[in-house]
Amino acid sequence: MKSRRSRCRRSFTTLVRREEERLARWALELARRGLTGEARRVAEQLFQLAASTRVRPPRRVKRLFCKNCRTPLIPGLTARVRLRSQGGMSYTVVTCLSCGWIHRYPYRKGPRGGAPISPPAAEYGSGGRDSGEREDKGPQGPPRQGGRDNRQGGGHQGGPKGD
C-alpha cells in the first residue's frame, strides 16, 4: 500500500502537468493568431509554474518553446525546421524566427519506409499524446523532386569525356 504522501504528490503532479499542457495549448493558439507577445507571457507563466511547483514539464512541451525568448515554436510561422546529418549523427535543427536561437535535437534514423524512431517534425505544433505508432499506414507520397542530382542545365550530364 502506498503512503498518503506519495498518493498526494502523484495527484498534485498530475494536476500541475494538466495545467502546464493547458497553458502550452493556449500559448500555441495565441501564436497562431499572431499574438506573439501574449503567447510569450503565457509561456513565461508556464515555466514559472513549473519552477515554483518543481514539476518539470514533459519534453514535448518544453520543445514547443524557444529557450531564449519563450516564443512558441510553430514550423513555418515562428520557427524553421530542418533535418541535418553531421559526423554520423542526425539532428532536427529548429531555428526561432523571433530571436535566431538555434535548437538541435538528435534523432536516430529509422529504416527507410518503416515507422520513424523519433517523432516527426510535424508533431512540433501538436500538443497531442505520442502514441508511438503512425496513424496512417499508407505510403508517404511521391518521392521528392529536385536536389543536387536532378538540377536542370549546367554540370556534367553523364556522357563520355570530351563531349
Curated annotation (Swiss-Prot):
GO biological processes: tRNA 5'-leader removal
Keyword Zinc belongs to the record: yes
Protein location: Cytoplasm
Keyword Metal-binding (UniProt): yes
InterPro entries: RNP4 (IPR016432), Rpr2/Snm1/Rpp21 (IPR007175)
Binding-site residues, Zn(2+): 66, 69, 96, 99
Biased composition (Gly residues): 152-163
Catalytic activity annotation: Endonucleolytic cleavage of RNA, removing 5'-extranucleotides from tRNA precursor
Cofactor(s) listed in the protein's UniProt record: Zn(2+)
Cofactor note: Binds 1 zinc ion per subunit.
One Pfam family it belongs to: Rpr2
GO cellular component, one term: cytoplasm
Summary of subunit composition and partner proteins: Consists of a catalytic RNA component and at least 4-5 protein subunits.
Protein family per UniProt: Belongs to the eukaryotic/archaeal RNase P protein component 4 family.
Function: Part of ribonuclease P, a protein complex that generates mature tRNA molecules by cleaving their 5'-ends.
Protein's name according to its UniProt entry: Ribonuclease P protein component 4
Species of the source: Aeropyrum pernix (strain ATCC 700893 / DSM 11879 / JCM 9820 / NBRC 100138 / K1)
